[in-house]
């Protein structure tokens, strides 16, 4: 027998020491202790209900597991690499504490369905927590939008000045992204929140278990329908990693803008000192380390997605040891996403907006040129002709170092006799912004309406 191994009956030689270290997962899967114990308690209660094991053994098992939980949370539990993983560490300790009753716990289950349960329980809780962090970030964005409700800034395409927009409208763009992220997390929860326990190693179990009872005890709305798929499925983890990658992409895009906006060239915003660092050599520096690091961590999350996809891509049914590699990418992504969301929500809430700088930038770069074209269209000119006229007026302004509002009416009429003095009212920043009143536009009225809609939870 391989000494001290709960599976060692078939073996005549001990496990190689380095193999033992190489194959152990306890260093990282010990974070599943709470889920493992919770699942074992539910399994034990079901075994007792079904009279598969005696009720007195069930009570010993439950009491022993609760004591082990207390020991782990008090930092008094010594994890052993020789016991490989969290499941064997807990089961071995349980048997040492309560004797033969502890050895009955694993009746009717395998580590294959046990670990599938633990991961689903763990991810289920984390999905709820990540959704709550997304709510905090959305609240920070809405708060900034409300504080700066009428602040005008340049909108960009190709990072070139395009049209004036409200800063609040820009914040609401990220609100939409993070609301979609929350929706994806909620969808992922539906496919995560399914009980796999009862699948056994791969084919089910010969014992008369009651899977639906375990599902009820663990708050799962349904059970898996195929034992092979139950133990080999990691789609729910992959789906989360994909959703997390999109979420981090949104944070990375936002980070890029915050980094640009905080430069001395833009000066659109000031990030709080608490979210920046200095230079070891340049005394004047205030570096936006937080958004830079979030931007960098995005690649890490992408890598975790690719790592698990690559692990799973060639695995035959059912369980394979390769699948031990599912946990570190999952755990690392959860930690990264939660940390990034928390720090981002706090940073955005404390961010200061330089309103005059934004407005002055919006007034440059011919940002109201489209409004001139729209003005001519309303006067009866076809849009393509209007586009040509305004393009020529912009070229004239560039050559004469002027902006559109600085043109005299005589100069305007040189481009089209349709233009009259009312052109000046049409190309103010406020007029440009507020003319875009359709749903989803940047008008002040529309932005206020959108903030109210999101605040109402719609």
UniProtKB/Swiss-Prot annotation:
Enzyme class: lyase
Single GO MF descriptor: argininosuccinate lyase activity
Subcellular location: Cytoplasm
Entries under InterPro entries matching the protein: Arg_succ_lyase_C, Argininosuccinate_lyase, Fumarase/histidase_N, Fumarate_lyase_CS, Fumarate_lyase_fam, Fumarate_lyase_N, L-Aspartase-like
Keyword presence, DNA damage: no
Catalytic reaction(s) noted: 2-(N(omega)-L-arginino)succinate = fumarate + L-arginine
One Gene Ontology cellular component: cytosol
Gene3D superfamilies noted in UniProt: Fumarase/aspartase (C-terminal domain), Fumarase/aspartase (Central domain), Fumarase/aspartase (N-terminal domain)
Residue ranges that the Swiss-Prot or TrEMBL entry lists as coiled coil: none
Matching CDD domains: Argininosuccinate_lyase
A Gene Ontology BP annotation from the UniProt entry: L-arginine biosynthetic process
Main location group: cytoplasm
One Pfam family cited in the UniProt record for this chain: ASL_C2
Annotated pathway: Amino-acid biosynthesis; L-arginine biosynthesis; L-arginine from L-ornithine and carbamoyl phosphate: step 3/3
Top-level taxon of the source organism: Bacteria
PROSITE patterns: FUMARATE_LYASES
Transmembrane domains' residue ranges: none
PANTHER family named in the record: ARGININOSUCCINATE LYASE (PTHR43814:SF1)
NCBIfam families (alphabetical): argH
Family that this chain belongs to: Belongs to the lyase 1 family. Argininosuccinate lyase subfamily.
Record-given protein name: Argininosuccinate lyase
Native organism: Geotalea daltonii (strain DSM 22248 / JCM 15807 / FRC-32)
């Amino acid at each position: 027998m391989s000494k001290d191994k709960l599976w060692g009956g078939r073996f005549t030689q001990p496990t190689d020491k380095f193999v033992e270290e190489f194959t152990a997962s306890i260093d990282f899967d010990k974070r599943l202790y709470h889920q493992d114990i919770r699942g074992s308690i539910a399994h034990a209660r079901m075994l007792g209900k079904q009279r598969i094991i005696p009720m007195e053994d069930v009570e010993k098992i439950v009491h022993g597991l609760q004591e082990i939980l207390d020991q782990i949370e008090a930092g008094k539990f010594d994890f052993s690499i020789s016991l490989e993983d969290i499941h064997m560490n807990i089961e071995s300790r349980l048997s040492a504490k309560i004797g033969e009753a502890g050895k009955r716990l694993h009746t009717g289950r395998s580590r294959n369905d046990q670990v599938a349960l633990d991961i689903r329980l763990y991810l289920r809780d984390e999905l709820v927590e990540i959704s709550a962090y997304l709510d905090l970030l959305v609240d920070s964005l809405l708060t900034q939008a409300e504080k700066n409700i009428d602040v005008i800034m340049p909108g960009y395409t190709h990072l070139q000045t395009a049209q004036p927009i409200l800063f609040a409208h820009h914040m609401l763009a990220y609100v939409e992204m993070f609301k979609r992220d929350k929706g994806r997390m909620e969808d992922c929860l539906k496919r995560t929140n399914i009980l796999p326990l009862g699948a056994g190693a791969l084919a089910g179990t010969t014992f008369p278990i009651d899977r639906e009872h375990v599902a009820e005890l663990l708050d799962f709305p349904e059970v898996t329908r195929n034992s092979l798929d139950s133990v080999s499925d990691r789609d729910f983890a992959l789906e989360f990693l994909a959703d997390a990658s999109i979420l981090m992409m949104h944070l990375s895009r936002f980070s890029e803008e915050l980094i640009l906006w905080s430069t001395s060239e833009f000066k659109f915003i000031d990030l709080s000192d608490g979210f920046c660092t200095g230079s070891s050599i340049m005394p004047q520096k205030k570096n936006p380390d937080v958004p830079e690091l979030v931007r960098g961590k995005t690649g890490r999350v992408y890598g975790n997605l690719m790592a698990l996809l690559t692990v799973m891509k060639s695995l035959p049914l059912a369980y394979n040891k390769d699948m031990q590699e599912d946990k570190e990418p999952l755990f690392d992504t959860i930690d990264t996403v939660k940390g990034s969301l928390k720090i981002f929500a706090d940073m955005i809430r404390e961010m200061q907006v330089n309103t005059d700088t934004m407005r002055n930038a919006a007034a440059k770069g011919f940002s109201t040129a489209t409004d001139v074209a729209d003005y001519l269209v309303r006067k009866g000119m076809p849009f393509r002709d209007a586009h040509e006229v305004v393009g020529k007026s912009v070229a004239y302004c560039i050559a004469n170092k002027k902006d559109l509002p600085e043109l005299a009416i005589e100069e305007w009429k040189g481009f089209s006799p349709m233009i009259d003095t009312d052109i000046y009212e049409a190309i103010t920043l406020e007029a440009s912004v507020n003319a875009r009143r359709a749903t989803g536009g940047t008008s002040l009225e529309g932005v206020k309406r959108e903030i109210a809609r999101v605040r109402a939870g719609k």
